[in-house]
Curated annotation (Swiss-Prot):
GO MF term list: lyase activity
Annotated catalytic residues: 29 (schiff-base intermediate with substrate), 87 (proton acceptor)
Job of this protein: Catalyzes the formation of 4-(hydroxymethyl)-2-furancarboxaldehyde phosphate (4-HFC-P) from two molecules of glyceraldehyde-3-P (GA-3-P).
Annotated EC: 4.2.3.153
Enzyme class: lyase
Known catalytic reactions: 2 D-glyceraldehyde 3-phosphate = 4-(hydroxymethyl)-2-furancarboxaldehyde phosphate + phosphate + 2 H2O
Phylogenetic classification of the source organism: Bacteria, Bacillati, Actinomycetota, Actinomycetes, Kitasatosporales
NCBIfam families found in the cross-reference section: PRK02227.1-1 (NF002573)
Keywords: Lyase, Schiff base
Alphabetical list of InterPro entries matching this protein: 4HFCP_synth, RibuloseP-bd_barrel
Family recorded in the similarity comment: Belongs to the MfnB family.
Keyword Kinase (UniProt): no
Protein name, entry field: Putative (5-formylfuran-3-yl)methyl phosphate synthase
Bilayer-crossing regions: none
Amino acid sequence: MLLLISPDGVDEALDCAKAAEHLDIVDVKKPDEGSLGANYPWVIREIRAAVPADKPVSATVGDVPYKPGTVAQAALGAAVSGATYIKVGLYGCATPEQAVEVMRGVVRAVKDHRADAFVVASGYADAHRIGCVNPLSLPDIARRSGSDAAMLDTAIKDGTRLFDHVPPDVCAEFVRRAHDCGLLAALAGSVRSGDLGELARIQTDIVGVRGAVCEGGDRTTGRIRPHLVAAFRAEMDRHVREHAAAAAQS
């Protein structure tokens, strides 16, 4: 599993740089603008400069509306600013067809600029609360649009978590569908270290966290700390090893 950590600015990105050996992707977002809140282009550039060159930078485009042209232009802005991974939260898309239209525009915009860009179509485990596309439709949306990964997060940060809305067995189906489509499967949404056993069991490719590596476990008021990143990674790797050993014995 790959570990994606989401600092909210340059200062936290520098702390991520201190823990670079323990993480795989640095994700730029603005938590006070939503689950996948987009940060400023200059912040993406500054974070790209702050973290080691071998660590890819991801940037969220936002919890986006159904406005394909607007979203495509925003996604290109993230790519031009230095992000390799481009994440789009399909917040305002009520149907799979709308979501595919939005993501096709994003894929064309960013891959015309940078062929190796990695596009992530992100939905929400709590989609029923906001009226957007069903979580299990995301892998097919990603496949049809030419995206590289399907992701689930939570839209409303009120203390509920990924597994509160999409139980582990349903997340396993999400991962299976993504893999069947030739995509990576990413899961986030107030993930804690106690969830890592299930995430390893269902063969999640990317785990995204913020609160779990912040002081006090608070994604908004807490700050990312290198020792918390290291501890989370150690626990994640332990579960991956245990799952691999169990699978080899079965």
